[in-house]
Amino acid sequence: MSVGKIRYQIGDKAALLEAVVARECEIIDLRRDQWRTQLVSCPELDRASVTDIVAQVLDEAVDAGHVSAIVMAEIYIQAYRDPALEPLRVRLWAHDHGFWRGLFEGFPEARGLVRRIAYYSIDERVFSVLLGQSRDYRLLRQSTLRALLRPAGAQGRSAASAWHLHLIAQLAGPAQAALEGASEIKGTKAVLARQIADAMARDGVEAISFRQIATSAGVPLSTLTHHFLSHRDLVLGGVEELYRRMRASLGRPGDARAGRQVLLLTHEMALGALRDSRLTPFAIDMRRRRAENVHAQVAPLVDGEGDRARSQAFTMALIGEAIALGEQGQQPGSAAFPVRLCELARD
């Protein structure tokens, strides 16, 4: 059962969530100690070696650690929506950040990269679980990691940027048919889809039920089930409406509220896609577009002009920071995000 279902369907289960987070913190610390044992006899690490280590840690999230990766993503997102979960977020982040700090504390060159790696990993982890079996995705992730860890002032080669864009296109291609299916709908079904989307934006995907939507829309349950035959159809109808809204909001880079919704819903789409593969194209496209939307703003601040991989990598790191730090984080579109981005790029 997901964290969202615990929160919405079971009720206030603070003690249960506290126990879940405590267990995840123990797992994080155990994995940190295992990695430190692996690295203890290594005299030094360069950035290429750090890239390899981060990729391996993410691969482990796909395999034996996938349950923990999903739980952590859900805790962070639910805490972003529910201030009552803030203490759990703070505790989880302390151990999550401590994992990377513990790995690299003995390596001066790697130590300065810990913050950007930790933030990037927050954004990346659930997508590695969702898409980690895809060759194109794994290659894209490796390209992004190299760009994230490249020293400031070390421009990426044009061939590397072309390769990165090629991988993005390869990954987006198979999703196109499904995205084209999210065409505009009209009439009663469109009104209901907007109600579903409003509920998702407010409470998250896990909160959606036939009874809730029928009540908020003021229609009989039979009317709702006529247009949406199953719970999956109900969710997909709301997702398609949110997707259309997101496409419109991405034309307004300064819209902080829209940016927050995209941040939350992109991760919720990835989590939802782990249960229903029909959501996967939306998760892929939302994630791609959120980085493309702020490329012009991000690139000059991170030595990434003409380098899509680097601007995408730092966008991911900044989004990870916003998720990890809650209201203290600076998401793309906020007034303080240029300063924060420059700080990350100087590590």
What are these regions (language model features)?
Residues 64-73, 80-106, 259-264, 277-302, ...:
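Amphipathic alpha-helical packing segments from all-alpha helical-bundle domains
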